[in-house]
Structure formats: structure tokens, C-alpha cells
């Protein structure tokens, strides 16, 4: 697939937004489900972008920046893996498997850029001492621009080179045993990521519903909409029938009416 100039510009814009979003953590544009979908729309294959994004999202659910700890770069992994799958004609499994080392490489880039922006912090301190609010604003924007370029530059390089004959020949020269291994590894990574998320979020009293969902999906022909409706109905019934949530509103008032002091006053 040959990527046009307009598509490269749009990929650059999406990559900039994702790069800034991975630092701001506010609008979640760096999440795989959003970033991959946007790249898929730009490259004309939104369906593949959604599939890659949904799969990567299951892996990256626990990836987040906490304090000084830098998480793997989901934005860089999402954008480049989507470009390789759609424009480079790689399989989705191979793209998922390649996303993990890409995320690790992006993590290193994030640490490097954050180290560089330390100088910006000192410059902002000096501007604050001088009362120069305009300089502080420009320093913040400049440091955020570096974070945007951290994702945008590698994404544009891949987008420019993935359609060339040299890169295509290199990708096609990968042995079949390696591509099959990447596909298998991609499936295993998704399972492991999903298991890690369940292990962190599991609630023992809700696990029967979890197993029931797997059995229902395996032995019926229901689509995702039907399964979602069934799950919603069961959740509502559980809340209505559970003693934890189903408390009589008049019980406290009745208990107050049986107070000995009230009886004496009567």
C-alpha cells in the first residue's frame, strides 16, 4: 500500500496528539483503542485499526504512569504496529507481537525526553522568579512539543519507508516460521495481558458470572450485542436481589420508632 502525502500529514497529527496524550493522561488519545482506530481511519482501514486497538488495549490496560515510574509507551506501539499491519501488509498477530518491543523502545524514548525536559523545568523556575508568565507558558508548550515529536517522528519515518520496495522485500523475506511464531506469540500476549488484568480486578463473588459468560459465548451463537444485553440484565437482577444492595428504606425509621425513650414520652 502506498501512503499519500495527505495520509502522512494526518498520521503525523494523530501521532502528535497521541504523544501529548501519553503525558497529559487526560483525554486518553494515547490509548491503543483510540490511537489505532484513528490511524486506521487515516489509512482507509478502520476495521483493522479497531481490531488491533481492541487487542492491544487488553494488553495495555495496566500500563499507566504512576509518579516517577514510566509505563511502556502504548502510543508509539499502537501507531507503528497499525501502520505495519495496514500499509506493510503484515498479519494482525505479527503486529501485536511487534507492539511489545515497540512499547519498550518507546519507554526508553520517554525517559530520554523527560531527562531533557529537566532543563526546561529549571528555565521555568528562573522565569517564575522573574515573574515572566509568558515565558513559563512557552516553556510548558515546548516541553510538550518534544513529547509529541517522540511519537510523531518514528511514526512518520515508518510511514514513509513502509511502502518502499526495499522495506517490502525485507518484510517478505522474513521466514514463515518467524511470522508464525509472531502470530502465536501475539495470541499468547493477549491472553497473558487479559489474565493479569483479571487477577488485579477479580472479585470472588462475581467469578461465577465470569465463567458463565465464557460458557455462554462458547456454546451459543449469540453476538456481542446479545451477550452485552444478557450481562446487563443479569447485573440488574443481581443488584436487585443481593442483600448488599437490597435494603429496606423504612427499616431505620421503624427502628427509631421502637426507641425506649420515645415510648416513655408517649
UniProtKB/Swiss-Prot annotation:
Subunit comment = Homotrimer of protomers that are composed of two subunits, IIC and IID.
Q: Which residues lie on this side of the membrane: Cytoplasmic?
A: 125-132, 201-207, 243-266
Segment forming the signal sequence = none
What is known about what this protein does?
The phosphoenolpyruvate-dependent sugar phosphotransferase system (sugar PTS), a major carbohydrate active transport system, catalyzes the phosphorylation of incoming sugar substrates concomitantly with their translocation across the cell membrane. The enzyme II ManXYZ PTS system is involved in mannose transport. Also functions as a receptor for bacterial chemotaxis and is required for infection of the cell by bacteriophage lambda where it most likely functions as a pore for penetration of lambda DNA.
Which species is the source of this protein? Answer: Escherichia coli (strain K12)
- NCBIfam families reported in the protein's UniProt record: EII-Sor (TIGR00822), PRK15065.1 (NF011647)
Q: What is known of its domains?
A: The PTS EIIC type-4 domain forms the PTS system translocation channel and contains the specific substrate-binding site.
Where's it found, cell-wise? Cell inner membrane
Q: Which residues carry this modification: N-formylmethionine?
A: 1
Question: What Pfam family is a match, any one?
Answer: EII-Sor
Q: What is this protein called?
A: PTS system mannose-specific EIIC component
Alphabetized GO MF terms: protein-N(PI)-phosphohistidine-mannose phosphotransferase system transporter activity
InterPro entries for this protein: GatZ_KbaZ_carbometab, PTS_IIC_man
The record lists the membrane-crossing segments as 91-124, 133-160, 177-200, 208-218, 225-242
- UniProt intramembrane stretches: 5-43, 47-86
Q: What result is annotated for mutating residue 65 to P?
A: Significantly impairs the mannose transport capacity
This protein's UniProt keywords: Cell inner membrane, Cell membrane, Formylation, Membrane, Phosphotransferase system, Sugar transport, Transmembrane, Transmembrane helix, Transport
Could you mention a single GO BP entry for this protein?
Answer: phosphoenolpyruvate-dependent sugar phosphotransferase system
Query: Topological domain, Periplasmic: which ranges?
Result: 1-4, 44-46, 87-90, 161-176, 219-224
- Gene behind this protein: manY
Q: Does the keyword Transport apply?
A: yes
Q: Name one GO cellular component term.
A: membrane
The UniProt record lists the PTS EIIC type-4 domain at 3-237
Reported induction: Expression of the manXYZ operon is positively regulated by the cAMP-CRP complex and negatively regulated by the Mlc transcriptional repressor. Expression is also weakly repressed by NagC.
- PANTHER family referenced in this protein's UniProt entry, alphabetically: N-ACETYLGALACTOSAMINE PERMEASE II COMPONENT-RELATED, PTS SYSTEM MANNOSE-SPECIFIC EIIC COMPONENT
Amino acid at each position: 500500500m502506498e501512503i499519500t502525502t495527505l495520509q502522512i500529514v494526518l498520521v503525523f497529527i494523530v501521532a502528535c496528539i497521541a504523544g501529548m496524550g501519553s503525558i497529559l493522561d487526560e483525554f486518553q488519545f494515547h490509548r491503543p483503542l483510540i490511537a489505532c482506530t484513528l490511524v486506521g481511519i487515516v489509512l482507509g482501514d478502520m476495521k483493522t485499526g479497531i481490531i488491533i486497538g481492541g487487542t492491544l488495549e487488553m494488553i495495555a490496560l495496566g500500563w499507566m504512569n504512576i509518579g516517577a515510574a514510566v509505563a511502556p509507551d502504548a502510543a508509539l506501539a499502537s501507531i507503528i504496529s497499525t501502520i505495519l499491519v495496514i500499509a506493510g501488509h503484515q498479519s494482525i498477530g505479527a503486529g501485536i507481537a511487534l507492539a511489545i518491543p515497540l512499547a519498550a523502545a518507546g519507554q526508553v524514548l520517554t525517559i530520554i525526553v523527560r531527562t531533557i525536559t529537566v532543563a526546561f523545568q529549571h528555565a521555568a523556575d528562573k522565569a517564575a522568579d522573574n515573574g515572566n508568565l509568558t515565558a513559563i507558558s512557552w516553556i510548558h508548550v515546548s516541553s510538550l512539543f518534544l513529547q509529541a515529536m517522540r511519537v510523531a517522528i518514528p511514526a512518520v519515518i515508518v510511514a514513509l519507508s513502509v511502502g518502499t520496495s526495499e522495506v517490502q522485500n525485507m518484510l517478505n523475506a522474513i521466514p514463515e516460521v518467524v511470522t508464525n511464531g509472531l502470530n502465536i506469540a501475539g495470541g499468547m500476549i493477549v491472553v497473558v495481558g487479559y489474565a493479569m488484568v483479571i487477577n488485579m480486578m477479580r472479585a470472588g463473588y462475581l467469578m461465577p458470572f465470569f465463567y458463565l459468560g465464557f460458557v455462554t459465548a462458547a456454546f451459543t451463537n449469540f453476538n456481542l450485542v446479545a451477550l452485552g444485553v444478557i450481562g446487563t440484565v443479569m447485573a440488574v437482577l443481581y443488584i436487585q436481589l443481593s442483600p448488599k444492595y437490597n435494603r429496606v428504606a423504612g427499616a431505620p425509621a421503624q427502628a427509631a420508632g421502637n426507641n425506649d425513650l420515645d415510648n416513655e414520652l408517649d
